């Protein structure tokens, strides 16, 4: 299996399976002399960690991260990067592979069982193996390192829709996001989602969600035309997340309903004499290059395919059969996708920052003369 690495200069390679001994990643291309602490990485992982509420899988994984290489202890505390590959390891401790014994030969509808088998002629049926969302913990660890490449930049995510219930954007409050199990920025939507997901969970079913990401403080100029577009790389990174089925940047598909007057972001000079956009329909990216405005992206996640309802399928011998999935699963995988989406955005931004610096050096001076 190839394609376990993403990025150009800031490169992340992940390894491991859901029920293997461990999962991990190697971060290559990270600049030297960046300070961070193990607690920085652990805090990011804890936001994604399973089993923290009744609305996520009850698999109990502490997700304790170990740094194996690429750092030295800093005299003032914490660690400092050396510029060599940074290896991060997370041991798996709560696997229950016996839950999957009955489906070893049959394909679960909606999962990657059939496609892995038809491509490789073999698959790891234990919790989905390499295709499991368990792998995303490694991306979160890598994202915590990527964040150190971009001081002054913030990346935040929130769930904005679960099933048919969407937040009221007039009540958006980032301070509310860590105060509920849904990463929800609208406090009045929280009880609605609680009631809704309780019903979904008790029925043994699942539901999809939409996650919104906002990056602020991103320097103008990151990204490159035509095949190195920042939004294209961001979309690719987000679609690489398990269960992701769609991505929007800025207005996204809604832009198809707008007129040119409505969609184009007008510009004036701000208080510091630099261009300022009066709106942000573009989502902070024009021509594949960051404008300096907040970068706004959304990605949609399908319902978890592991449900208790019996489903029709076929097995490896070509026989029709019926299947239902045991094990522990998220009733809404979109909830824990928030820190994963943030991490992928961090990695893409760090990569483009290093690529931009390598090509043009410091940011181009503005205004232009003559």
UniProtKB/Swiss-Prot annotation:
Q: Which SUPFAM superfamilies match?
A: Chorismate synthase, AroC (SSF103263)
SS bond list: none
Q: How is the cofactor bound?
A: Reduced FMN (FMNH(2)).
GO MF annotation list: chorismate synthase activity; FMN binding
Q: Which cofactor does it need?
A: FMNH2
Q: What are the entry keywords?
A: Amino-acid biosynthesis, Aromatic amino acid biosynthesis, FAD, Flavoprotein, FMN, Lyase, NADP
Q: Cite the annotated pathway.
A: Metabolic intermediate biosynthesis; chorismate biosynthesis; chorismate from D-erythrose 4-phosphate and phosphoenolpyruvate: step 7/7
Q: What is its EC number?
A: 4.2.3.5
Entry-linked InterPro entries? Chorismate_synth, Chorismate_synth_AroC_sf, Chorismate_synthase_CS
Q: Carries keyword Lyase? A: yes
Q: Name one Pfam family in it.
A: Chorismate_synt
Which residues does the record give as NADP(+) binding sites? 48, 54
Biological process GO annotation list?
amino acid biosynthetic process; aromatic amino acid family biosynthetic process; chorismate biosynthetic process
Read off the Gene3D superfamilies from this record.
Answer: Chorismate synthase AroC (3.60.150.10)
Instruction: List the GO cellular component terms.
Output: cytosol
Q: Which residues form a coiled coil?
A: none
Please list the reactions this protein catalyses.
5-O-(1-carboxyvinyl)-3-phosphoshikimate = chorismate + phosphate
Task performed by this protein: This reaction introduces a second double bond into the aromatic ring system.
The protein's assembly and partners = Homotetramer.
Recorded protein name is Chorismate synthase
The record's gene field reads: aroC
